Amino acid sequence: MAKLHDYYKDEVIKQLMSQFDYNSVMQVPRVEKITLNMGVGEAIADKKLLDNAAADLAAISGQKPLITKARKSVAGFKIRQGYPIGCKVTLRGERMWEFFERLISIAVPRIRDFRGLSAKSFDGRGNYSMGVREQIIFPEIDYDKVDRVRGLDITITTTAKSDDEGRALLAAFNFPFRK
């Protein structure tokens, strides 16, 4: 079992129960899933770019990504409905906790000119979204084999009812928020 999951069970639940005066352990917010999304708009011209992006996402997450397709045609972007334009992975359970641990302890500190993540990126329901400009911050990506640097979106979905609860949950994991 991931260390972070044990830490959540042993420490974070107690901390949040006292902070928010919950009556039941089931009211304590928890991390439900982590979604990684990589939009590859350039895949219209070259299908190999999408395969490389999917391989990078598979290396980062340890799970085969789902190829996302365009929902509708947009002439300005020269895309048609059904064109493959990105890939995504939804992590739950053990893989989610392992990825979350690597994200906090290894990947985020490797971001260039890192001064902390914005605490304002919550959606109003306790879910946190962040963007990464370079996939090379993850140790699983070999810098020499990267065809081009691309970013990805990371969404941490929680069971929190409000942004304050979600912020407290992530802060309990020592999430590197900007001061």
From Swiss-Prot:
The Gene Ontology CC terms held by the record are: ribonucleoprotein complex; ribosome
State any single GO MF term.
Answer: rRNA binding
Regions crossing the membrane: none
List the SUPFAM superfamilies: RL5-like (SSF55282)
Domain of life from the UniProt record: Bacteria
Q: Which Cys pairs are S-S linked?
A: none
Keyword terms: Ribonucleoprotein, Ribosomal protein, RNA-binding, rRNA-binding, tRNA-binding
GO annotation (BP), single: translation
Q: State the family it belongs to.
A: Belongs to the universal ribosomal protein uL5 family.
Q: How does it assemble?
A: Part of the 50S ribosomal subunit; part of the 5S rRNA/L5/L18/L25 subcomplex. Contacts the 5S rRNA and the P site tRNA. Forms a bridge to the 30S subunit in the 70S ribosome.
Q: What does this protein do?
A: This is one of the proteins that bind and probably mediate the attachment of the 5S RNA into the large ribosomal subunit, where it forms part of the central protuberance. In the 70S ribosome it contacts protein S13 of the 30S subunit (bridge B1b), connecting the 2 subunits; this bridge is implicated in subunit movement. Contacts the P site tRNA; the 5S rRNA and some of its associated proteins might help stabilize positioning of ribosome-bound tRNAs.
Q: What is this protein called?
A: Large ribosomal subunit protein uL5
The gene designation is rplE
